Amino acid sequence: MKKILLTVSLGLALSACATQGTADKDAQITQDWSVEKLYAEAQDELNSSNYTRAVKLYEILESRFPTSRHARQSQLDTAYAYYKDDEKDKALAAIERFRRLHPQHPNMDYALYLRGLVLFNEDQSFLNKLASQDWSDRDPKANREAYQAFAELVQRFPNSKYAADATARMVKLVDALGGNEMSVARYYMKRGAYIAAANRAKKIIGSYQNTRYVEESLAILELAYKKLDKPQLAADTRRVLETNFPKSPFLTHAWQPDDMPWWRYWH
């Protein structure tokens, strides 16, 4: 056991030494570089997808030229490098640091846009990919945070070059948030928790009126009211369904769990 621990410890030590050695080497190589040369080299590494080295060069630049405009831009570029390298937490931390240090920076719109992208492009599970990346199965917290980032961008910087794309992504995120609620409503219906299902359906109808889930929400709500022995409410809901979705298949047959795609049973 001691031999194993010694081997592991030695391996970790060697790894740490190698990392430190690389950092020291970068510091030595760049010691006479101007801020412009440092930034240009870091950009070359970033554009070549050498994200780890790009971050190292940005860090060296910021430590040597902390008051330069390149240092401020390097903070944003560091966040982008982490984002491209699938280092979500580091990217978000770098963005928050930039926002805290430079609340009035002219590139704040980009910082908000990048924060939204990091959250928006979170890795998908196998089932999501299998179902053509149905965003309703994403973590609703990530969806909400991404939406808030894009919304802040659009509200604060309506003329930003990123505003149009942010708005389009917000539409998709609203649909996803409605889908999250629908997944829960379906689950409650399947389990016979009709009050809870009705509440979720009403939330979709009230808060996500422009999503593709309203039609099914009305069908779930109608059936839930029937199961709860509330015929008048069920009839009222059906009239709303008929008015807004006159060709709905739910008008000829009531909602049932079999209407759910097979993969949702594992959600």
Curated annotation (Swiss-Prot):
| Entries under CDD domains matching the protein | BamD
UniProt xrefs under Gene3D superfamilies: Tetratricopeptide repeat domain
Lipidation, S-diacylglycerol cysteine type: C17
Q: Which residues form the signal peptide?
A: 1-16
GO BP terms: namely:
establishment of competence for transformation; Gram-negative-bacterium-type cell outer membrane assembly; protein insertion into membrane
Checking PROSITE patterns in the record gives: PROKAR_LIPOPROTEIN
Pfam families per record: YfiO
Q: Which GO terms describe its cellular component?
A: Bam protein complex
Membrane topology qualifier: Lipid-anchor
Q: Which InterPro entries match?
A: BamD, BamD-like, TPR-like_helical_dom_sf
This protein's UniProt keywords: Cell outer membrane, Competence, Lipoprotein, Membrane, Palmitate, Signal
User: Where does it live in the cell?
Assistant: Cell outer membrane
Keyword Magnesium (UniProt): no
Top-level taxon in the UniProt lineage: Bacteria
Q: Provide the lipid-modification sites (N-palmitoyl cysteine).
A: C17
Quaternary structure, per UniProt, is: Part of the Bam complex.
Q: What does the UniProt function comment say about this protein? A: Part of the outer membrane protein assembly complex, which is involved in assembly and insertion of beta-barrel proteins into the outer membrane. Required for efficient transformation of Neisseria gonorrhoeae by species-related DNA.
- Family per record: Belongs to the BamD family.
Q: Please report the name of this protein according to its UniProt entry.
A: Outer membrane protein assembly factor BamD
Q: Which organism is it from?
A: Neisseria gonorrhoeae
**What are the top taxonomic ranks of the organism?**
Bacteria, Pseudomonadati, Pseudomonadota, Betaproteobacteria, Neisseriales
